[in-house]
């Protein structure tokens, strides 16, 4: 076994099912996020924090309702909590659907607008496309799947890093760096 294979097997970027679009996108997005953070671009996390907060509110309402409220003794409180749970759930779903969709990372551009990075799989071309929209224009960079993952499902870091760095050199000037 060569030293390169040992390095690959120690990797946390491993896909257990090469036919799983979700898993391929998730592992690749984790790698891309890590590389972009290393380059010190300004990431916007407040929207993720809103998602986390709404999820925690749902957990608290559900837990309180199931542990402390008995329907036979307090039916009005139970109904109020269920309505609150439904309202918060609907808010979270709407927020996810309209704002996040497939977005895995939000960065700030130099002009102050948001840059939402997302990945999509093009099965016909056998590529994973890293893209973002800015001023109604879509900018894309493609990863060849056969070069992105080896036959054992390990991310080929040198190739992936090279594509991410090419993406950042081509589009990084529009992204804002941290102060």
UniProtKB/Swiss-Prot annotation:
The keyword Cell cycle does not apply. The chain crosses the membrane at residues 49-69, 75-95. GO terms for biological process: protein transport; signal peptide processing. Its main location: endoplasmic reticulum. One of its GO terms (cellular component) is signal peptidase complex. It is found in: Endoplasmic reticulum membrane. It is a multi-pass membrane protein. Belongs to the SPCS2 family. This is Signal peptidase complex subunit 2. It comes from Plasmodium falciparum (isolate 3D7).
